[in-house]
Amino acid sequence: MVSTLKNYLLKLLHIGPLWVCKLEFKLQKFTRFNERPIEYGFVFRKLAQIYPCKVLDVGTGTTALPRLIRNCGCHVTAIDNIKDYWPSGMFNRFYYVMNDDITNSKIVDKFDLITCVSVIEHIEQHYAAVRGMINLLKPGGYLILTCPYTEQKYVRNVYDLPGSNSGKNIPFICQSYSRIELNKWLEGTNCKIVEQEYWQLWDGDYWT
């Protein structure tokens, strides 16, 4: 009797998510390819090399990345600054996302690996954000960052550049970092860059 009731309740709980999934399936349209295959490919190559037990994903948003990492066996925590960056609220149906500001994190755990995929460019206090992530690493831990990059010049918001093809009416900035920012991120820490990959997805000088 208890088992039957439990199964019935589970079916009721699944009605909403199933309806949303079916609706998304029916309404999907191809728009363009993006950089995620490159970024996720790098993340999962590093997972296979590092084999981290505890992983923190910073700035998850609505993505499925923490669920995919969890499927690899890792213990995963996902965070996002929901209050400030998602004024209308945000719900991730793939994974539980904690509300936490990485520039002033309240998390006390330490992690073997931290991922921050296409997020740091949208955080104005990027120095505090990177330092916050470094502080959450275990000794010998790894931080994976992906972001727009221009070796010689920092750009505060590539969406504002003349001829920009993206980012119109978006309520947040998209920074392109230079070597200066990278070096400053590492100042006063025991961290070092162990691997970098560069990809050009736009035909201009900047990410736009």
Which residues does each predicted region cover?
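Non-catalytic N-terminal targeting/anchoring module and adjacent flexible stem/linker
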Residues: 1-8, 41, 45, 208
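S-adenosyl-L-methionine-dependent methyltransferase catalytic module, highlighting the catalytic core
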Residues: 30, 89, 103, 115, ...
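Conserved SAM-binding loop
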Residues: 41-155
